[in-house]
Amino acid sequence: AGGRAATARALAALGVSSDGLVQVDGSGLSRDNRISARQLSALVHAVLASGGESAALWRGSLALAGQTGTLEKRLVGTPSAGRVRAKTGFIGGTSSLSGIATSLDGRERVFAILVNYPDVDGLNNSCWKPMQDEIVRFLVERLP
C-alpha cells in the first residue's frame, strides 16, 4: 500500500493523472498492473520536462536503438538507429516499447506503444517488434 501511495504522489508531483492506473506490485511483473499509453507518454514527457540531473540520468539509462541494451539489435542499418532511446517490456500476452524518438530534424517525440495479444500458438513478443519498429521509424524518419 505504501508503494502505491508513493507512486500516486510522484505522479501528482509531475502532473500525471493516476486515474485508471492499477499497481498491484512494485516490480511491474504482475499481469494485473495497468497503465494507459497516454499515462506512460505523459510520464516520459514529464520526467524529461523536469530537467536537471534526474532527467539526464533517466534518459541515459534507456537503451539506444541499434547500439545498447534491449534495443541493440533493433533498427540497425536504418536512419532511426541511434535516434531512439526506449524501454522495452514483455510479459506473456503483452509487448511494449516506450521512450523518446529524435526526428531527423532534431525534434524529440515521446511515445508509448502497448500491445495486448491473446495467448495462442504462434503469437509471441517477436511478432510485435517489427510493428513497433515501424511506428518508431515513422516518428523519426517520416512524421513532419
Place the predicted regions along the sequence by residue.
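A small/polar active-site loop signature that marks catalytic segments
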Residues: 1-56
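A short acidic/glycine-rich loop-to-helix N-cap element
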Residues: 117-131
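Hydrophobic, well-ordered secondary-structure elements that form the walls
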Residues: 40, 98, 111
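Solvent-exposed loop/turn segments at secondary-structure junctions
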Residues: 27-31, 47-50, 90-91, 104, ...
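Active-site-proximal beta-strand/loop segments in catalytic clefts of secreted hydrolases
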Residues: 24-26, 61-66, 88, 113-117
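Short, gly/Ser/Thr-rich active-site loops of penicillin-recognizing serine hydrolases
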Residues: 130-144
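Short, Gly/Ser/Thr-enriched beta-strand-loop segments that form substrate-interacting elements
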Residues: 73-105, 114
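Active-site lining segments that contact anionic ligands and/or coordinate catalytic metals
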Residues: 11, 18, 57-59, 79-81, ...
